[in-house]
Amino acid sequence: MEYVAIDFQTANRWHKSACSVALVTVKDGKIIDTFYSLIRPGILHFDKENTALHGITKEMVKDAPYFDELWPLIKEKINGKTLVAHYARFDMDVLEEELTGNKLAFPSCPVFCTCVLSQAMFPEMPQHRLQDVTEKIGFNLEQRYNAMAQARACVAIVEYALKATGAEFLQDVADAYHFHLGYIGKDVVTECNFIILIEGVRLVMRILMLLLLCKSPRLITIWIT
């Protein structure tokens, strides 16, 4: 079983401002490849709040490759593999914005969110930030906002869950904790989310429909059956 942990850092509040990326490829529980690069954003503007977190400045990326220059290598490493990220919605938004903005072809990848996994594994925890989860499982996250450190932390969380459940595949872990994997592909990006939440929305919709039809019992009977 092979997957790739991925993490982006951004230069500013806009998702299309990736300034670093890290990939950690894992096969059968062992790291077989790592990749890290700074990225020069299309608009070379860094919010001071972002720099305060990850320490990357515009001077550091002025000679770095643009995202579209890196993409062929990144795509080769991730295409067809499950992507793992903490709060994957952010990283997939960054990836989607960069691909769309640069008119690049999307990969085809299932998406596994370790934040959703943590919420399922440790419901008693008040927060599920990466540093909280790694502390819970006994993994030392040395640099909280370094892309490579965060990607390695995601690997640690996944391997912890695989061992805890006795699962062989990430889909088995998702099934054990009752959530769906997300997906990124051509013209579609779906989030990793709890099955119970999805079913809950459907139940609420059915109840609302019943309330709307409550003045006509005959319609309710027809609709239910």
Locate each region found by the language model.
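Conserved non-catalytic scaffold segment of RNase H-like nuclease domains
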Residues: 1-108, 123-145
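Active-site flanking residues adjacent to catalytic metal/cofactor-binding acidic residues
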Residues: 6, 112, 149
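Short, glycine/acidic-enriched loop or turn micro-motifs at the edges of active sites
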Residues: 10-12, 116, 153
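Conserved beta-strand -> loop -> alpha-helix junction used to position metal-binding or nucleic-acid-contacting
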Residues: 105-118
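Residue-level recognition of specific faces of alpha-helices
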Residues: 114, 133, 172-175
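Generic alpha-helical structural context detector
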Residues: 116-119, 135, 156-159
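Acidic, divalent-metal-coordinating active-site segment for phosphoryl/phosphodiester hydrolysis
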Residues: 146-160
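Acidic two-metal-ion nuclease catalytic site recognized across multiple nuclease folds
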Residues: 158-224
